[in-house]
Every structure is written in C-alpha cells, then in structure tokens.
Regions:
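Solvent-exposed, non-transmembrane regions of integral membrane proteins
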Residues: 1-174
Length: 174
C-alpha cells in the first residue's frame, strides 16, 4: 500500500481515515453544527473554497497526491464511501438537530446525518475531488469535454449548495 501508482486501496484508506477522524471528532467535540455557514456566510465561504481549490490546482498540480485526487480510483472510493454512509444513516432513525442523542448513535452521529462529522468530512472530500477533476479538465480543455464539464459542474454546484443550513427538515407522521 502507498506504492505508486495509488489505487482503490489508498482511496478507501483515505476515506476510512476521514471516517475515523470524523468519529473521533464527534465523540470528543460533539456533532458538527454548520449553522455558521447560513446565508450570507455560505456565499463567502463558497467563494473562498473555490479560490482555495483553484490555488491548490494551479500551484500543486504536478504533485502526485493532487494528480491522484483527480483519478477515477479516488472518485469511486469516495462515492462508495458516501453511499455506504448514506445507506447506514438511511436505515437508522433520524432525529431533529435540537434533540440530544446519547449512546452509540450519538457517538457515531448516524441518527443525525446532517450533523455527523464523519459524513461532513467525507462529503467535503468528495466535493474537493470533484472540484479538482473539473479544474483538470478545464486546464486541458477540448470541445469533446463540454458534456463532461457541464455534468460535473452541475453536480458540483448542487453538492456545494446542499448543506445542512439549506435543507429543510420535514417530519411525517403516519
């Protein structure tokens, strides 16, 4: 492992590390409250984030780690990790953010998906990878890249737009 070329094992290792860091963060500091990023701060944070992605790509694109970030192995491992987290959280009863959750559910954050630090870190990793891939394709632009760029830019903007401060929680009772 960690022998070039990096592949799926390294991608899943990074995602597992992010999950572990997020879980430890959740256990020690509590859930991720992203209310700081409510309007209009989310616009400023989004612009700064895109500028940081641009700087990362422009100044460090020749580094192996940054090139690896735009590989399909990294993207697939990030997507699978997010899908697994989403399925686990989808099978776990969800509680409103203001409800205090105790026990293992509270430690792991599975019962408050939008506040789970592990989910937030994995989602941030996925959006970062998506941004790096878009910048790489723009840098080496050809006409046949237009459909790729349109679909990935749309996904990027939708993913960046979906954060816990913009999602309205709807409760249904049977």
């Amino acid at each position: 492992m960690w022998q070039k070329p990096w592949g799926y094992k390294e991608g899943f290792a990074v995602c597992g590390g992010l999950f572990l860091v997020g879980t430890l963060w959740q256990v020690t500091l509590g859930k991720c409250t992203l209310s700081l990023f409510a309007w209009p701060v989310n616009i400023y944070a989004g612009v700064v984030y895109v500028l940081l992605l641009l700087a990362l790509y422009l100044f460090f694109r020749k580094y192996y780690f940054v090139r690896w970030m735009s590989s399909y192995q990294t993207a697939v491992s990030a997507m699978i990790s997010l899908v697994v987290m989403t399925v686990i959280m989808g099978l776990t009863r969800q509680y409103r953010p203001e409800v205090a959750v105790t026990g293992v559910e509270g430690w792991l954050g599975f019962s408050q998906m939008l506040s789970a630090c592990s989910f937030v870190l994995l989602f941030f990793w996925f959006v970062t990878l998506l941004g790096i891939v878009i910048l790489r394709r723009i840098h080496h632009f050809t006409v046949r890249d237009i459909p790729f760029l349109l679909s990935h830019l749309g996904l990027f903007f939708i993913a960046v737009r979906l954060n816990s401060t913009t999602i309205k929680i709807v409760c249904s009772t049977a």
